[in-house]
């Protein structure tokens, strides 16, 4: 991937919140040291990661966030367990105001036929595997526009974390999907995840009444 404005923006948006959470668990001097090292790790991870389509692919954002999480984890150099890193990630992002705005905007468009038709096309296209490091998915229409499903056959986040030798972070990041659903104003049902060794991830979203 390119270390472009998009990649820099993810770091700029979230690094302050990560620093605040790390101060709680590691203390201010260590938190500052970890975040200084994080910027170097993040840049290297982004540059050595294969592209999944850049800003043209909405899921690039997910992979960039995973790269930042991996960078913080590596920069902590054993001072955070995977579970602690998962909590740090969840708390940091949930306390970022831009995240809440983004999820509210996401909810408005995701529960429309126009977005769902576009997402279905993206899912069909993903099976061509033009970007091997990316996601492969199927889209499932609900009975109304107020519900839909996405079944992931391959996960770009899991692939990145595996390449970076920190696959143990994947199940922790999966838990954040339920936080995202909360801010989207919907219920998420999921019985399987690739991160936990299943063959797929079966997301089902239903808008709250």
Language model segments and positions:
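Generic structural marker for isolated residues within well-ordered, non-membrane alpha-helices
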Residues: 19, 157, 177
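N-terminal, charged low-complexity regulatory/assembly segments
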Residues: 1-76
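Conserved aromatic-histidine-acidic binding/catalytic patches
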Residues: 56-64, 161, 165, 169, ...
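Hydrophobic, Leu/Ile/Phe/Ala-enriched alpha-helical segments that form helix-helix packing faces
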Residues: 22, 72, 76, 127-128, ...
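Amphipathic interaction/junction segments at domain boundaries or subunit interfaces
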Residues: 64-70, 74-164
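Short, flexible segments with low predicted structural confidence
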Residues: 44, 152-154, 174-175
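Short coil/loop linkers at secondary-structure junctions
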Residues: 29, 79-83, 167, 187
């Amino acid at each position: 991937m390119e270390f472009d404005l998009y990649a820099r923006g993810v770091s700029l948006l979230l690094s302050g919140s990560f620093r605040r959470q790390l101060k709680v668990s590691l203390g201010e001097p260590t938190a500052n040291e970890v975040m200084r090292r994080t910027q170097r790790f993040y840049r290297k991870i982004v540059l050595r990661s294969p592209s999944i389509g850049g800003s043209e692919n909405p899921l690039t954002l997910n992979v960039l966030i995973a790269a930042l999480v991996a960078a913080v984890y590596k920069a902590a150099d054993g001072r955070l367990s995977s579970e602690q890193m998962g909590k740090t990630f969840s708390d940091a992002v949930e306390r970022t105001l831009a995240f809440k705005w983004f999820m509210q905007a996401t909810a408005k468009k995701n529960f429309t036929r126009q977005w769902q038709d576009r997402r279905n096309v993206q899912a069909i296209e993903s099976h061509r595997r033009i970007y091997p490091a990316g996601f492969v998915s199927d889209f499932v229409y609900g009975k109304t526009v107020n519900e839909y499903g996405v079944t992931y056959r391959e996960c770009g986040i899991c692939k990145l974390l595996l390449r970076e030798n920190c696959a143990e972070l994947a199940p922790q990041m999966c838990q954040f999907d339920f936080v995202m659903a909360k801010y989207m104003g919907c219920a998420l049902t999921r019985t399987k995840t690739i991160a936990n060794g299943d063959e797929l991830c079966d997301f089902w979203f239903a808008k709250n009444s």
